[in-house]
UniProtKB/Swiss-Prot annotation:
Gene3D superfamilies: 3.30.160.20, 3.30.230.10. It comes from Nitratidesulfovibrio vulgaris (strain DSM 19637 / Miyazaki F) (Desulfovibrio vulgaris). With S4 and S12 plays an important role in translational accuracy. Residues 8-71 form the S5 DRBM domain. GO terms for cellular component: small ribosomal subunit. Pfam families: Ribosomal_S5 (PF00333), Ribosomal_S5_C (PF03719). It comes from the Bacteria. One of its GO terms (molecular function) is structural constituent of ribosome. This is Small ribosomal subunit protein uS5. The gene is rpsE. InterPro entries: Ribosomal_Su5_D2-typ_SF (IPR020568), Ribosomal_uS5 (IPR000851), Ribosomal_uS5_bac-type (IPR005712), Ribosomal_uS5_C (IPR005324), Ribosomal_uS5_N (IPR013810), Ribosomal_uS5_N_CS (IPR018192), Ribsml_uS5_D2-typ_fold_subgr (IPR014721). Part of the 30S ribosomal subunit. Contacts proteins S4 and S8. GO terms for biological process: translation. SUPFAM superfamilies: dsRNA-binding domain-like, Ribosomal protein S5 domain 2-like.
Amino acid sequence: MEQNEFGLVEKIVYLNRVAKVVKGGRRFSFSALVVVGDAKGAVGFGLGKAQEVPEALRKATERAKKDMVQIPLVDGTLPYEILGEFGAGCVMLKPASKGTGIIAGGAVRAVMEAVGVTDVLAKAIGTNNPHNVLRATMAGLTSLRSAEYVSQLRGMKLEAPRK
């Protein structure tokens, strides 16, 4: 895990070279998909496009930092099982007991490491397109609600508060 000077974890999920065919030949550009998190519950992702790789990465990282969201975590895992969907991508995320580790692949693993989840079971269903899998993962994570928040919505008191 790469940590920058602000203590943020940056992960490159996908780097793609695309070609535009013009009269003189092919013109290449790059797109980068990056996940940024603080490993304490905040995570964001960004897509950057440019003529050069470093510029695409910079743009993606900037966008990811700008769009960070807070995710409720319970002892290094998720509070409950969740299903995130985006396009054809569907990601199932299950909380796991301590010591399990991150059992996930590709884009899902990058997001989990950036957000600070240490134990989780995940399965990407439907597509293996990194863009859709990443957005499905983020959709699932952003729909998570903490026990405190739900009890406040219902106007009830928690018997045993959870961390």
